[in-house]
Amino acid sequence: MTNDPVQLAEKAKDVAGILKLLSNHYRLMILCCLADNELTVGELNMHIELSQSALSQHLAKLREHGMVETRRVSQTIYYRIANPKIKELLAVLQQQFC
């Protein structure tokens, strides 16, 4: 923890943004599915009851904020968690609440 008010404000803003994204249960479910594997939209859709269009919109938002990244193989796009801190946060949440 920092004592510098400017740094504290910046970090608090960053963390609040992450928590805001995680406050949507579908996005949280997506990240939980991606915690151990990279998956396609179709594979995610087998775990999460949501239209493929809505699922893609959530993935786009997570990607826009740097929480997931993609890897393309031919026409197939694989999603994975981009930030190791997000994986750590998910592990803590899972340990405490699941």
Each model region followed by its residue ranges:
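Conserved segment of winged-helix/HTH DNA-binding domains
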Residues: 3, 15, 80-98
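Residues within the DNA-recognition helix of helix-turn-helix
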Residues: 58
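N-terminal helix-turn-helix DNA-binding core of bacterial DNA-binding proteins
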Residues: 13-53, 73, 77-84
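Short, intrinsically disordered or compositionally biased N-terminal tails of bacterial proteins
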Residues: 1-10
